């Protein structure tokens, strides 16, 4: 399947649900606004506490939104604010999955940090050499350190991004397999995404035009665009795990294209 197939399936599943999807997004924005507003009331000396609270709360909220859209996709009854309950009822699971993904990503993250240190060190030493007499080899060495750091940053960033794609289905897998542990969900996501990471990347990239339209509409369009993206991602997830319903949709789409 290609990106257009997943988007077509998303539009098919969204028939009669566009309004509900927009309401879920509006409710999510309202809840996050209230949380951020309350965090903003904290004294400046406790700003760090507000940031920690935001992080702790945002993970289950994000989990809940994905869960709400999955239920909507499956034609289950879901209210606009149900994401809040769905998220916090699975507070431990959402954070356990996030932590397991963090452990998987820790090595590339360390490499990225090292690359930033090398860049900063190289630039700092080179800047100092402009005011202090250093030999040409030493100056060239500082430039070399910065260049190595930059190359390492590019390579490690690409590595981290491609590696992260392995785990993008972990939330969805855990939602449909309630008895599965967080570690198992992350592992199953990696298995499902093997050989399919590029497909998900191109699917996400195909929404760039919609993102521009959302920005032009002062963000209002995102109330409908984000549900569209979630539904397309769920369609991809169904395909990645071998769900027969998605295969059937692909067959229908292929037949219609052949007929044309």
Please give the residue ranges for each predicted region.
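Hydrophobic alpha-helical membrane segments
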Residues: 1-260
